[in-house]
A protein has these predicted regions:
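N-terminal leader/targeting pre-sequences
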Residues: 1-148
Length: 148
């Protein structure tokens, strides 16, 4: 049995924009034999309604510059699938008092495929059906995925 390495294969350091200036944290990626373990740990998420759910996606481009992170492109979707079946569609983050932790294993991509792309957190939940991206609202956090 293979043991999980304590060192991730890639990491994205998340920072907030104008709508969530205190947002920070990391998203780690561990390549496993059967998929990728994605582990997110964040603080400083907004505590206002509509809910404590925040959409969480991998976007095509690794450019977190500019207010509102306009240069991240669409969801990472190498197979041109409809939303919510993009490779970059991840489960929502659930915040409690501004903090969120999520660990999920996905078989939709390999770590090497997402290095250089971005992780984006949106202000609201993903409705899981609106096209092309789930109507999750503004981008409030971003981090570029870098090989460790």
């Amino acid at each position: 049995m293979r043991k999980l390495s304590l060192c991730p294969d890639a990491v994205a350091k998340i920072h907030g924009g104008e709508q969530a200036p205190c947002l920070k944290g990391s998203v780690k990626f561990f390549q496993l034999p059967g998929g990728v373990l994605v582990e997110a740990e964040l603080t400083g998420l907004p505590s206002q309604p509509p809910s404590g759910f925040f959409a969480f996606h991998i976007h095509e481009k690794g450019d977190c510059s500019g207010e509102g992170f306009p240069n991240t492109g669409g969801h990472y979707d190498p197979e041109s699938r409809p939303h919510p079946f993009h490779a970059g569609d991840l489960p929502p983050l659930l915040s409690c008092k501004g903090g969120a932790y999520l660990a999920v294993i996905t078989g939709r991509f390999c770590v090497k495929d997402v290095i250089g792309r971005s992780v984006v957190i949106h202000v609201g939940p993903d409705d899981l059906h609106s096209q092309p991206a789930g109507n999750a609202g503004a981008k409030i956090g971003c981090g570029v995925i870098c090989k460790t």
